[in-house]
Amino acid sequence: MARPTDPIRALLTSPPDLPVVEVLPELRERLSPNPSGSDGVGACLVLTAPPGTGKTTLVPPLLADVLTKRTATGPTTGAPDGKSPGRGPGRVIVTQPRRIAARAAARHLADLLGEEVGGNVGFAVRGERRAGPATRIEIVTAGILLRRLQRDPELAGIDAVILDEVHERSLEGDLLLALLTDARTALREDLTLVAMSATLDADRLCRILGSTSGGASPLVEVPGRLHPLAEVWAPPGRTGRLGPRGVPREFLTHVAATVERALAEHSGDLLAFLPGAREVDDVVARLRGAAREGVDVLPLHGRLPASEQDSALTPSPAGRRRVVVSTNVAESSLTVPGVRVVVDSTLAREPRLDVARFMSGLVTVGVSRAAGVQRAGRAGREGPGVVYRCCSPTDWARSPLAPTPEILSADLTGAALELAVWGVPDGAGLAWLDEPPAAALAAAREALERLGLADTDGVTPLGRVVAGLPAGVREARALLETAPVLGARRAARATALLTADLRAPGGDLTTLARQVRSGGPGSGAWKTEARRLEHACQRAASDRLADPEAMGTAALSDGAGGGDPGTGHSEPARSGDLEMAVALVAGTAQPQWIARRRGPAPQAGKEAHYASVAGTGLRLPAGSALAESEWLAVAGVDLTSGRGDALIRAAAPLDEETALELAGAWLAEEERTVWDGGRLRTERVRRLGAITLSATPGPPPGPQEAADAVVARVRAQGADTGLAVLPWDEEARSLRARLALLHEHLGEPWPDVSDAALADRAEEWLAPAVMSLAGRAGGSGGLAGSISPGSGNRRFSLELLDIAEALRALLPWPQAAHLDELVPERIEVPSGSQVRVHYTAGADAAQIGQTGRPVLAVRVQECFGWATTPRIVQGRVAVQLHLLSPARRPVAVTDDLASFWEQGYPQVRAEMRGRYPKHSWPEDPWNTPATRGTGRRR
């Protein structure tokens, strides 16, 4: 039989030996149209397949072939009139989560077809596209397809979309799935949708895709070829995987040593997983320094030029071994041939959002078990393999089952803008694998409104322009905002330093600017990114000519020193221009991260700490040249689990004037009350968000200000510790204890004086007392007796507050008149003395207000003849008697006097009469007169 002339059909006729081949007939049947070929309804299908089974290699050609036959027997899809000018039939878009995976998949498939990329198979990633009118399979990143979908919700000219590696749960991937299913339901029921996943809950995915056609989508499962995989545990000993500043260098030394060990113990190529590009480059440098004979050590991460990425994916010459040190880009969506050994650091870097501070960044965490299984599986694709895990079995057992989907943990500002452009700002009605968290989405929408990209009516004209630019929301807006000042080219060059995925040495963007401008590492990627952004800026200028409102305050015009952005002509960048420009762009992109150093510059090799406008603490890497700068425009941070501050990864120095201008929305002046050593004073404060710029003494606090401040302090510190700051003297303690006793035994209307109740009712009892104190110096707000000598600012002192008098405001009327009757301050004893009742005996500051036994401490001689124990609170509570020696030391404790005289007193008399012979110790205390003095011995 003659080989088909169509290279795609030829590939399917003689496919490579891959597990997915077993299900190709079933896939063809489920994806083929009805016999009539004109029902106009595309198929929806979910395919699950382990990594390495060939789904990315053979499913797109199969679908392209099926669609070619469908368009040959029925109307051409993707166009309302059945026509699709300028292309061949059967156009398939395949999404990949990463640029490197999209390029690699396109190159591999084109090689199988015997073609160059750009023919039947093409790709499109940020800044690069190789595809033409005849391209039938185009492999793109999710972000590329998302922008196409927003421009054309009908996706005219596209017959099918394959969402690959859905299990990775990227934010753009989840958003794209939701919008595609919405578009298919409303506009393109003929669009074929296929979701391919390795580990995801397939039933849930089937329900979501099936929701576009009223039922669950079919599921096709590809069996994997399982080769034996051995596990070796390689914990780092005393060195932890994570420290307070991220991944310790000692742990990277351990990973490199584990790679050396694995090379010595096993044959074949080795793939090592590290959490990020910094760690990859560190371990690569260590391994290359070891200079093992016949071994090529290659890095693999998204920051590398495409040529270096290709080298890592290309087998080494015969007789040489490869060690590929990679981030998670090689976890599932890339094939690294020849690998028989995997060394897994068991760490991953994931995006996180702190909603309370609206601080987003990357966090290094322990890898999930699902991701760890994916990593290990790379060693068993071609034969028996082994995985070395750099953790203990106990740590592995504690690992989460699956990684957290980005939509549940990342900054949703970009997603919120996409939803606003789509017309559903809250995402309601869309089919989500996981709905966006309400708090994070609300914070994102608030950020969009602050940036002028959205309002209560939805997306603004400026927001629509920003959404169409190939950059993050904040960076795209900064490009448009700074172009009038810098010129389009200079603004694009500065913005490219933030978007080109380059590493700033010591977190210093100005050092990076000098590095790339002089042709150093990263210069090629920077120039490519800058050209791309400049062209985007020019297109935005053209849009402005058609709709000036669309540019808002960012209307592009000739900028100082920047030339005409519309023509792209500008003056060559002068020395220092790029450094100044990147500070302006970074501060415009992230004004809430503008920061001022805390204290003086640190000693050499130490970390410098900064306070940001948003209130989050920031720190520079130790030894960073930026530590001399008081003000910084921060563009990127890493978050460390368990730490409240964030590590600055990209920043540029600012002067104070520019900082105040860029973050002007946070500039405010206020008069506030502050505490100073237990005293209250006022000051006039000028601040930039959470950064205090200046504070000058203000007038004495007025009565209401003082009351509000005291009440706020009590509540802010918690009921127990807050009340402890008040000046509780013995009278106040006693009154509170008396009221607590009444509330416990008689209930309402006697007040609850527990910590929580007093804090809750502070406006009723505490505030009036504070206002009275604050107003006693003549009604001007001055405070008699609370002026510090030599101070120009009179201050309110809590020490002058009469807490007992304040508590009396809680006494109920008319019951207050019976207070001393129910819980008397003093009780008359037989000697005629009025002895104080101790209602707080044994209580410390933390126990004020807790009910306990009232105590009457009195000398034995004053109680002779007293047979009945006194009782209070309408007879409900017996007073506990502490009977004292002449030296006022307790000799007995009782609440039953009759029993004491009969049983306890004889022993006390025997012990005391010799020690205190001048005092009365009668044999018959019942009939002996009580006395305050010594009396006569009997």
Q: What do the predicted segments below correspond to?
A:
Residues 1-474, 478, 551-557, 561-570, ...:
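P-loop NTPase motor module signature
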Residues 22, 26, 54, 58, ...:
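Generic recognition of stable, solvent-exposed alpha-helical segments in well-folded globular domains
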Residues 51, 600-632, 835-838, 842-856, ...:
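Segments forming glycine/polar-rich beta-alpha architectures that bind adenosine-containing cofactors
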Residues 152-167, 174-177, 345-349, 358, ...:
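Extended active-site and interfacial segments that coordinate phosphate-rich ligands
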Residues 162-163, 295-297, 303-305, 309, ...:
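Charge-dense polyanion-binding interfaces
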Residues 454, 489-609, 614-617, 630-826, ...:
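Acidic, serine/threonine- and proline-rich low-complexity intrinsically disordered segments
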Residues 805-871, 876-877:
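C-terminal accessory/binding modules appended to enzymatic or scaffolding proteins
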